[in-house]
C-alpha cells in the first residue's frame, strides 16, 4: 500500500530513468511533486526503500534503482480521506541499464575548479559508462583545482557535461567568461548579475554582468580514475 505521493514519485523516477538513464535530482523531484522542501523527498524515498520498491545504489550520487512498480492498471483504489493508493499486485523487478554499456565522448581538455582558465578544443575521446549520461549531447573535461571539493568534485576528476546554453538556479555548469575563460561552478542569478559559486570556503564567489557569461553545459556526472 503506497500513498499517492509515493506512487507519484516512483513513477516520476522510472520515467526519468527510461528517458535518460539517470535519476532525477532531489530538486527536480521536489518540483515535480510540488513539495516545498527536499526533506519531503527524503522521507518518500526512505518509505519506498522500506517497502521494496526502490533502492539507492551505494557510492554514487543521484543513483536510484526502481526494483518494481505497482500494477496500477489492474487494481488501484484511492481513498481521498487518507490519500492512500491500495495496490494488489506488482510486476517483477525492472532491469537496470547494463553496467558495461560504454559510450565515447569528446574530451575537450582541462577546466578550472578554482579560477577561470583557458577553454580547450577537442583532443581525444573518453570512454564513459552509459549509465552516467543522460539524454542529449555530452562532452568531458578534466577538472583542475579544488574549489568544488565540497560538492565531491576533485582535481583530476572527469566532469561529464551535457551540452546546454541555459541553466537553472543551483545547477553546476561550465561557464565561459568573456569568451575565453571556462570554469566549473554553481550557477546563481543576482538581478542582472551572474554569480558563480565555488564549493570550497577558501574561494570567493565570482560575480559578472550577465552578458559576460555564457553557459556551455550542465554537469551530468563524474568519472574518477584510481592509480
Swiss-Prot record:
<keyword id="KW-0068">Autocatalytic cleavage</keyword>
<keyword id="KW-0235">DNA replication</keyword>
<dbReference type="Pfam" id="PF00717">
    <property type="entry name" value="Peptidase_S24"/>
</dbReference>
<dbReference type="InterPro" id="IPR015927">
    <property type="entry name" value="Peptidase_S24_S26A/B/C"/>
</dbReference>
<dbReference type="GO" id="GO:0045892">
    <property type="term" value="P:negative regulation of DNA-templated transcription"/>
</dbReference>
<keyword id="KW-0227">DNA damage</keyword>
<keyword id="KW-0678">Repressor</keyword>
<keyword id="KW-0804">Transcription</keyword>
<dbReference type="InterPro" id="IPR050077">
    <property type="entry name" value="LexA_repressor"/>
</dbReference>
<dbReference type="GO" id="GO:0009432">
    <property type="term" value="P:SOS response"/>
</dbReference>
<keyword id="KW-0378">Hydrolase</keyword>
<keyword id="KW-0805">Transcription regulation</keyword>
<dbReference type="InterPro" id="IPR036388">
    <property type="entry name" value="WH-like_DNA-bd_sf"/>
</dbReference>
<feature type="active site" description="For autocatalytic cleavage activity">
    <location>
        <position position="185"/>
    </location>
</feature>
<dbReference type="InterPro" id="IPR006197">
    <property type="entry name" value="Peptidase_S24_LexA"/>
</dbReference>
<dbReference type="InterPro" id="IPR036390">
    <property type="entry name" value="WH_DNA-bd_sf"/>
</dbReference>
<comment type="similarity">
    <text>Belongs to the peptidase S24 family.</text>
</comment>
<keyword id="KW-0238">DNA-binding</keyword>
<dbReference type="Pfam" id="PF01726">
    <property type="entry name" value="LexA_DNA_bind"/>
</dbReference>
<feature type="DNA-binding region" description="H-T-H motif">
    <location>
        <begin position="26"/>
        <end position="46"/>
    </location>
</feature>
<dbReference type="InterPro" id="IPR006200">
    <property type="entry name" value="LexA"/>
</dbReference>
<dbReference type="GO" id="GO:0006508">
    <property type="term" value="P:proteolysis"/>
</dbReference>
<comment type="subunit">
    <text>Homodimer.</text>
</comment>
<protein>
    <recommendedName>
        <fullName>LexA repressor</fullName>
        <ecNumber>3.4.21.88</ecNumber>
    </recommendedName>
</protein>
<comment type="function">
    <text>Represses a number of genes involved in the response to DNA damage (SOS response), including recA and lexA. In the presence of single-stranded DNA, RecA interacts with LexA causing an autocatalytic cleavage which disrupts the DNA-binding part of LexA, leading to derepression of the SOS regulon and eventually DNA repair.</text>
</comment>
<dbReference type="GO" id="GO:0006260">
    <property type="term" value="P:DNA replication"/>
</dbReference>
<keyword id="KW-0742">SOS response</keyword>
<dbReference type="GO" id="GO:0004252">
    <property type="term" value="F:serine-type endopeptidase activity"/>
</dbReference>
<dbReference type="InterPro" id="IPR039418">
    <property type="entry name" value="LexA-like"/>
</dbReference>
<dbReference type="GO" id="GO:0006281">
    <property type="term" value="P:DNA repair"/>
</dbReference>
<dbReference type="InterPro" id="IPR006199">
    <property type="entry name" value="LexA_DNA-bd_dom"/>
</dbReference>
<dbReference type="GO" id="GO:0003677">
    <property type="term" value="F:DNA binding"/>
</dbReference>
<feature type="site" description="Cleavage; by autolysis">
    <location>
        <begin position="113"/>
        <end position="114"/>
    </location>
</feature>
<feature type="active site" description="For autocatalytic cleavage activity">
    <location>
        <position position="147"/>
    </location>
</feature>
<keyword id="KW-0234">DNA repair</keyword>
<dbReference type="InterPro" id="IPR036286">
    <property type="entry name" value="LexA/Signal_pep-like_sf"/>
</dbReference>
Amino acid at each position: 500500500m503506497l500513498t499517492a505521493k509515493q506512487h507519484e514519485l516512483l513513477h516520476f523516477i522510472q520515467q526519468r530513468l527510461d528517458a535518460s538513464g539517470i535519476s532525477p535530482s532531489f530538486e527536480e523531484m521536489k518540483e515535480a511533486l510540488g513539495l516545498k522542501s527536499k526533506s519531503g523527498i527524503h522521507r518518500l524515498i526512505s518509505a519506498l526503500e522500506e517497502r521494496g520498491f526502490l533502492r539507492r545504489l551505494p557510492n554514487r550520487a543521484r543513483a536510484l534503482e526502481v526494483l518494481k512498480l505497482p500494477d496500477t492498471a489492474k487494481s488501484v483504489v484511492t481513498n481521498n480521506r487518507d490519500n492512500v493508493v491500495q495496490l494488489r499486485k506488482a510486476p517483477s523487478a525492472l532491469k537496470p541499464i547494463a553496467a558495461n554499456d560504454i559510450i565515447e565522448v569528446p574530451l575537450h581538455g582541462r577546466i578550472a575548479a578554482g579560477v577561470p582558465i583557458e577553454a580547450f578544443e577537442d583532443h581525444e575521446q573518453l570512454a564513459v559508462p552509459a549509465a552516467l549520461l543522460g539524454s542529449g549531447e555530452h562532452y568531458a573535461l578534466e577538472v583542475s583545482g579544488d574549489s568544488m571539493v565540497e560538492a565531491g568534485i576533485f582535481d583530476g576528476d572527469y566532469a561529464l557535461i551535457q551540452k546546454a546554453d541555459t541553466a537553472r538556479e543551483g545547477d553546476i555548469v561550465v561557464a565561459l567568461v568573456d569568451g575565453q575563460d571556462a570554469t566549473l561552478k554553481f550557477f546563481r542569478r543576482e538581478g542582472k548579475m551572474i554569480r558563480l559559486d565555488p564549493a570550497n570556503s577558501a574561494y570567493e564567489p565570482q560575480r559578472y554582468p550577465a552578458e559576460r557569461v555564457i553557459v556551455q553545459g550542465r554537469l551530468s556526472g563524474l568519472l574518477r580514475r584510481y592509480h
